Amino acid sequence: NIIFSRKFCIYDKKADTDVNVYRLQNMEFFKTHQSIHFSIIPNNIIFREPEKRLKVTILKNYQWDSQINNLKPQYKLNSKLEYRYDTESKFEGGNEYLYFDTKEIRSTNQNISYVNKSKLYETYLKIDNDRKYGNYTYNQDINGNFEIRTLNGSQNSKTEADYTWVHFSLASKMNFDKNSIYIYGKFNNYKLTEKNKMYYNPSMELYEGVLLLKQGFYNYKYISKKIDSLNKNNISGSHAITENDYL
């Protein structure tokens, strides 16, 4: 029986790339999307029929479900292959991730409102609001990633970090009656499962969720899913100037 599986890449650098992120010229996407322009510099490799034999994939923030494939070089400049698409290489900019830090498991901080120490630690985050119609605010996030760390151990955070039940809550003016809401991040490899699904509490008028997580610094956001349609930004909003990693 398979216990777990994980996708990985074997990387062998054969060429250089030059990548830039631009706003789209198409005004429909000017405020919300990013267009990736790039060049492939072959160095000592000779690309024969690159439009047929060269396969290009772009990923946003190491998330495989974001990939754009099969872009063809538009023209050649000296030895460089140039890709200067507008809409064909577009991504939603998204928003900076929310975050919390439980490295000091007994203490509150900027984004933690309360810690219950009476049993297995329970960490209550401050209430989040939907950001779809808010202005962009820069936040130096780690693009959905997480880092295990603790101030309570003496040597190795990965083995000495403790666990805590982290309580999430989302207040939203939007109606998500036909959508499922999830807590989203690399902490579970961006999966949508019953464990990171949120449930509506009508008495508090909040969506709530609880995750058992090891001490550390975590990025997260809230996303919605309606049947087979996934929307990563209808709660957090999307901005063309958001900082992202592309590869």
Model-derived features: where do they sit?
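A short beta-turn/strand-edge loop motif at beta-sheet boundaries
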Residues: 44-51, 174-177
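Ligand-binding face of N-terminal immunoglobulin V-set domains in extracellular IgSF glycoproteins
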Residues: 1
